[in-house]
UniProtKB/Swiss-Prot annotation:
Recorded name of the encoding gene: spns3
CC terms in the record's Gene Ontology section: membrane
Family statement: Belongs to the major facilitator superfamily. Spinster (TC 2.A.1.49) family.
Its biological purpose: Sphingolipid transporter.
Full protein name: Protein spinster homolog 3
One GO molecular-function entry: transmembrane transporter activity
Gene Ontology biological process: lipid transport
Mode of membrane association: Multi-pass membrane protein
InterPro entries in alphabetical order: MFS (IPR011701), MFS_dom (IPR020846), MFS_spinster-like (IPR044770), MFS_trans_sf (IPR036259)
Keywords, sorted A to Z: Lipid transport, Membrane, Transmembrane, Transmembrane helix, Transport
Transmembrane segments: 49-71, 87-107, 114-134, 148-168, 175-195, 207-227, 260-280, 309-329, 343-363, 373-393, 407-427, 451-471
Tree of life domain: Eukaryota
Length: 498
């Protein structure tokens, strides 16, 4: 029997072929059997601890991301800035996050993933803490440091899900991924609450930006000592000892993977909606209450933070409930309905859009009704978080997952939440000139701006319906390639080729 070092290794290739759709496993092995699977000595206990640590850091990432939104009114009064300029704070963060995600995706598929995350987390802690010392005359410093914060987060967000994917397989992977993504809404909600609480307690919004870096120091220690670096594809039949391919080949593979493309477009629409609403909802609801005469407008700090508290609590609760429901529904339907996952995502997007539309329209007359429909809409939207991550992991081969995560992040932020907060603010500012005398116009112009979000949500639902048409085929192809087999070519009929 040949020794392992002389055994030929299968290689993923994306060179053009008339028979294979998304790539091939080429091997010189005469019978086509895959190489001996890689094994990993990582215990289940250590794997669970690793997921807990990754969840904790994910929580901190999203806490920091939405702390700014929780104290936005204070920032506007502190720097005397407009809506569009305020939206720029989120846009520059997302832009740096977006453009550097492909870089870290490339590195994550080729180099030590744990080391990359450590470097990124250190950068995030330093820049986040630095942004809290900005002075009133240096708004541009806050903008610059928020951009650098995105650099640190990009390294973590592209790599952490792939490590979970290599520690677990099957339904257990789905469960672990759902735990990881539960902390997106939980962290976001806590960002509003903790940001507003710390700002109220200290009388200075800048102290709110110092909470996440302090907790991040603990996260860094946990990352260094408790996170393993499993072999890529270790949970998927050992990964069949896949060799690294070129970045160009990886991109070609992903662009030919229709489930990945359509689901990425769906994620983009979802990012547009969540990014815009998450950033502007507390400010929007505060202006709605001023219009109804329920409270006085904020002229200078400190501003009333009650809307940040309520919206933060709603985000936490609905996020946990939505992710849990989405995961349970997926596990129950997946075996019977092969395309259940994208269908659940489509239902979540299409049903949440009317809820958000009604909530926006009712804001001028009933705040309780508005909060009710926001809660329903956020629950329906949160059905998608864990499912979307699982879709990417099972339709993409292991040695291209970090690149896939990075490419999806870049696209969804480029066309989604990188521009949506700024776009909403810019539309609101552009409408201000049409009515300069009515005090309620500050609310109305923002209301008309955020009404764009439900329509983008409907578009996202249609993208997920398209994903459902191809998910079964693409998942099977990825499973075959991962196990060292070649996907069977599709039979093309005469009518299809004409």
């Amino acid at each position: 029997m040949a020794s392992d070092q002389h055994r030929p290794k299968p290689r993923l290739s994306l060179r053009s072929s008339t028979t294979i759709r998304y790539g091939s496993m080429s091997s010189e092995h005469p019978d086509g059997d895959p190489s001996t699977p890689q094994t990993t000595s990582i215990s289940q206990r250590r794997s669970y601890i690793a997921v807990a640590v990754l969840c904790y850091i994910n929580l901190l990432n999203y806490m920091d991301r939405y702390t700014i939104a929780g104290v936005l009114l204070r920032i506007q009064k502190f720097f005397f800035i407009s809506d569009s300029t305020s939206g720029l704070l989120q846009t520059v963060f997302i832009c740096s996050f977006m453009f550097l995600a492909p870089v870290f995706g490339y590195l994550g598929d080729r180099y030590d993933r744990k080391l990359i995350m450590i470097v990124g987390l250190v950068m995030w802690i330093v820049t986040t803490l630095g942004s809290s010392f900005v002075r009133k005359s240096h708004f541009w410093v806050l903008v610059a440091t928020r951009a650098l914060v995105g650099t640190g987060e990009a390294s973590y967000s592209t790599i952490a899900p792939t490590i979970i994917g290599d520690l677990f397989a099957g339904s257990k992977r789905t469960l672990m991924i759902s735990f990881f993504y539960i902390f997106i809404p939980v962290g976001s909600g806590l960002g509003y609450i903790i940001g507003a609480t710390v700002a109220d307690a200290t009388g200075d919004w800048r102290w709110a930006l110092r909470v996440s870096p302090a907790l991040g120091g603990l996260g860094l220690l946990l990352l260094v000592f408790l996170i393993p670096n499993p072999p890529r594809g270790a949970s998927d039949n050992g990964g069949a000892n896949m060799e690294t391919t070129s970045y160009t080949e990886d991109i070609k593979y992903l662009l030919k993977n229709r489930s990945f493309v359509w689901s990425s477009l769906g994620v983009t629409a979802m990012a547009f909606v969540t990014g815009a609403l998450a950033f502007w909802t507390p400010t929007f609801l505060s202006r709605a209450q001023v219009t109804q005469g329920l409270k006085q407008p904020c002229k200078e700090e400190p501003c009333d933070s009650v809307d940040s508290y309520i919206f933060g609590a709603i985000t936490v609760v609905t996020g946990v409930v939505g992710v849990f429901l989405g995961t349970c529904i997926s596990k129950k339907l997946r075996d019977r309905v092969p395309n259940a996952d994208p269908l659940i995502c489509a239902v979540g997007m299409l049903s949440s859009s009317p809820c958000f539309f009604i909530a926006i329209v009712l804001a001028s007359t009933s705040i309780p009704a508005t909060y009710t429909f926001i809660a329903i809409g956020e629950t329906l939207l949160s059905l998608n978080w864990a499912i979307l991550a699982d879709i990417l992991l099972y339709v993409v081969v292991p040695n291209r997952r970090a690149t896939a995560e990075a490419l999806q992040i870049m696209v969804c932020h480029l066309l989604g939440d990188a521009g949506s907060p700024y776009l909403i603010g810019a539309i609101s500012d552009s409408l201000s000139k049409y009515n300069t005398t009515d005090p309620s116009w500050d609310f109305r112009r923002l209301e008309y701006s955020v009404l764009l979000c439900p329509f983008i949500g409907v578009l996202g639902g249609l993208f997920f319906l398209m994903t459902s048409l191809y998910i079964k085929e693409d998942r099977k192809a990825a499973e075959l390639l991962t196990s060292g087999q070649t996907p069977q070519p599709e039979i093309t009929t005469v009518s299809e080729s004409v």
